[in-house]
Curated annotation (Swiss-Prot):
Residue numbers bearing the Phosphothreonine modification: T202
Reported function: Actins are highly conserved proteins that are involved in various types of cell motility and are ubiquitously expressed in all eukaryotic cells.
Broad class of the protein's primary localization: cytoplasm
Sequence positions bearing Phosphoserine: S324
UniProt-recorded name of the protein: Actin
SUPFAM superfamilies from the UniProt entry: Actin-like ATPase domain
Gene: act1
Family label: Belongs to the actin family.
EC number of this enzyme: 3.6.4.-
GO aspect biological process, one term: chromatin remodeling
Enzyme class: hydrolase
CDD domains in the cross-refs: ASKHA_NBD_actin
Amino acid sequence: MEEEIAALVIDNGSGMCKAGFAGDDAPRAVFPSIVGRPRHHGIMVGMGQKDSYVGDEAQSKRGILTLKYPIEHGIVNNWDDMEKIWHHTFYNELRVAPEEHPCLLTEAPLNPKSNREKMTQIIFETFNAPAFYVAIQAVLSLYASGRTTGIVLDSGDGVTHTVPIYEGYALPHAIMRLDLAGRDLTDYLMKILMERGYTFSTTAEREIVRDIKEKLCYVALDFEQELQTAAQSSSLEKSYELPDGQVITIGNERFRAPEALFQPSALGLENAGIHEATYNSIMKCDVDIRKDLYGNVVMSGGTTMYPGIADRMQKEIQALAPSSMKVKIVAPPERKYSVWIGGSILASLSTFQQMWISKQEYDESGPGIVYRKCF
């Protein structure tokens, strides 16, 4: 009987929530981490307008809603909305009773302690889970790539981290966090499309720009060279059809938007680019393990999905590293979901079963138990 109850694995990202069952090779449910509330109250009585919508339903009704993301920069900032997202995950997406399944959640590196406690409290007290564990996202991505040592560049919708990991443990002193990720690139693309005369302003229109970004953007190997090519010919131009049938053309914006990952100054940020952040993280580690890190730079998250990003990263890090150093960039094809996949692997390991925090332990010790059991 013991065997049949699968653990749930939920990766709550700033942009998308990925959820499913431990042991599966992909998440069952992937939906936007958004909660939408009607902009205007229903006029027709009995139309059954809800006071809030979550995920895909919020996305499809976005024209009449105000959309909010409860997770910003990887960190939960609105617990009431977060609870709605979890409720939706359990009951509508996975269709499970949370009180029957152990639950593995993920968190951003350097997540504030209070957040970790609050997460633990909600899962046990609101949803009555029998067991719970929280794991760091980047560590799970590394597991998914079949490694226990390496440096993970995890870039999602809300935040980018470079996380050096040695023998399965993240090295907190060397973690770099960049508040520059997919959402910022979407905003930047909105801005540079405006310069072309296309206006996108509402939260609903921002979602259209996100789609343009995901379908058409790429990273140039040599940015200046690419700009020249774009200026001299129309070979890089692509067209995109808007929902109303209007067709827009996009040229150098295709690679100008993601270039901000390497040159954050384009967004008016003083941050290091992702290549420098990776290098700085490695340099904060012990000299003896740097070779292992340079040789295992693992990319994860949706913002690392641009064509050309791995080659560009290779070129940039090679230029920063000692000349004889072997640099290897690993960009697994499933990297959009590698955090979730790592969670699925971890939660189904027989050796992991003693790591869960049980409801009983929680009742005895309170939320603080999460620091003792989840490292």
